[in-house]
């Protein structure tokens, strides 16, 4: 299969709309004033906000009106999407075609949230029944554990779940369980990912072997960090339980497809939850990897989470480009990245429950689009993936917002708020203060404050320029009604399809991650060198020096 079989161009810069956008940027884009655009067009907000309605009737408003665009720019961006055949690649993904060209795989995480049970095919096989079978297994298992029907080796109920994984097997479940903490039930969940022994050691200090269930999350069951941590957990468990391997069956489950290795580890293969090769790690929270989520919030809430994502999938596949919310988000990202030279993208949730959301999106975006070679196997002559970062606000306002407001870099930003708090304490005082900052930050970034305003407020002399805000800094405001499982599912799927749109325009494969391989290979070599006491001289002078100093101090 040709690596370029889904697109008819090698480089995005070859597309006529790209040249058109470059001319528009030079003639008006770089001097466009959002404040003036609002003055010129009383209906700008009306035209540039889009409301998504979820399967349960809840709504999320996406306000794009504070972005550096006008009707002509939006039209040219839509033209770019058409020329890049974003919809063709999208449809190929939803048909189960092998759009992961470098690994010759389908990209079918969307099939995991196909709760309508439509037939969805990969290589001629309808995968919907298998997806349903795994979900049914997850439902039965999670309900047994949560109800107390599933008991540990001494007959006690499970109270704690420890998920051991890394990358997508960790970031997704961590973020989702934190975001949906309000829906937590009877179990406490803990996550171990880092190979640093501190992570597993500190976790084992706070759990009881009689009442703890370990989930080992590794598709291949060979991931070095995960299996090392899993073996440490198993050794700890056996040391506390009389070294009887038969007890493992009640306290360990595997989220994996490698039945041989799972059985060798000692886990009963009945407690094995599989997923297919067409599920990428950073898209795996919808799969068996989400078992910790189902255990924590209950299966019904987990299903609502899936349905929220499915609703965005339906919107993405069925909505015309002009009103297609994820597509517009992706096009704006390309506009800033490739024409304004923006290198970063800020996501600031005004919601403490979403405090891990930026870290999750960081992997989604940067592992997907941190590429420099196109589907046509040529190096790009344009910038691709942005550096995505963020922290929850209002904390973020007291750390890096200074640079966003008055620094020398353009940082397009997404602000996220839920109108209804799960904790409306003090007669909603906290929520109103939070919301006032959400609205004020976006407004301040847009309108700024000029020299005349600063002087009118009493500033004089050399202090004046320090108090000037240039404004005209773009934001997208995302206002949900409430953070529910369905809302969270929708927000994640929105960003997945934003990332997809970016990658389609840049003509890169957003679904591999070859960049993680070289470091792993070198780490294996160095790992062996750390097992002996001899002085190392096989690397460059810096690496040799660091290794030898480490060995001396270890």
UniProtKB/Swiss-Prot annotation:
Domain of life, per UniProt, equals: Eukaryota
State a single Gene Ontology molecular function.
Answer: carbohydrate derivative binding
User: Reaction catalysed by this chain?
Assistant: alpha-D-glucose 6-phosphate = beta-D-fructose 6-phosphate
Compartments (UniProt record): Cytoplasm, Cytosol
- Name the keywords, alphabetized: Acetylation, Cytoplasm, Gluconeogenesis, Glycolysis, Isomerase, Phosphoprotein
Gene Ontology BP term (one) = glycolytic process
**Keyword Hydrolase attached:** no
> GO CC terms on record?
cytosol; mitochondrion; plasma membrane
Identify the Gene3D superfamilies for this entry. 1.10.1390.10, Glucose-6-phosphate isomerase like protein, domain 1
| Residue(s) carrying N-acetylserine | 2
Provide the E.C. number(s) assigned to this enzyme. 5.3.1.9
Which positions bear Phosphothreonine? 53, 220
Per its Swiss-Prot or TrEMBL record, what regulates the activity?
Strongly inhibited by the polyol (sugar alcohol) phosphate D-glucitol 6-phosphate (D-sorbitol 6-phosphate). Also inhibited by the polyol (sugar alcohol) phosphate D-ribitol 5-phosphate.
Which top-level enzyme class is recorded in the Swiss-Prot or TrEMBL entry? Answer: isomerase
The record's active-site residues are: 367, 398, 520
In terms of InterPro entries, this protein maps to: G6P_Isomerase (IPR001672), G6P_Isomerase_C (IPR023096), Phosphoglucose_isomerase_CS (IPR018189), SIS_dom_sf (IPR046348), SIS_PGI_1 (IPR035476), SIS_PGI_2 (IPR035482)
Q: Which cysteines are joined by disulfide bonds?
A: none
Keyword Phosphoprotein attributed: yes
Could you tell me which pathway this protein works in?
A: Carbohydrate degradation; glycolysis; D-glyceraldehyde 3-phosphate and glycerone phosphate from D-glucose: step 2/4
Binding residue positions for D-glucose 6-phosphate: 168-169, 218-223, 363, 367, 398, 520
Pfam families xrefs: PGI
Its quaternary organisation is: Homodimer.
Q: What does this protein do?
A: In the cytoplasm, catalyzes the conversion of glucose-6-phosphate to fructose-6-phosphate, the second step in glycolysis, and the reverse reaction during gluconeogenesis.
Could you say which protein family the record assigns here? Belongs to the GPI family.
Q: What else is known?
A: Present with 91600 molecules/cell in log phase SD medium.
Name assigned to this protein: Glucose-6-phosphate isomerase
* Record organism: Saccharomyces cerevisiae (strain ATCC 204508 / S288c) (Baker's yeast)
Tell me the name of the encoding gene. PGI1
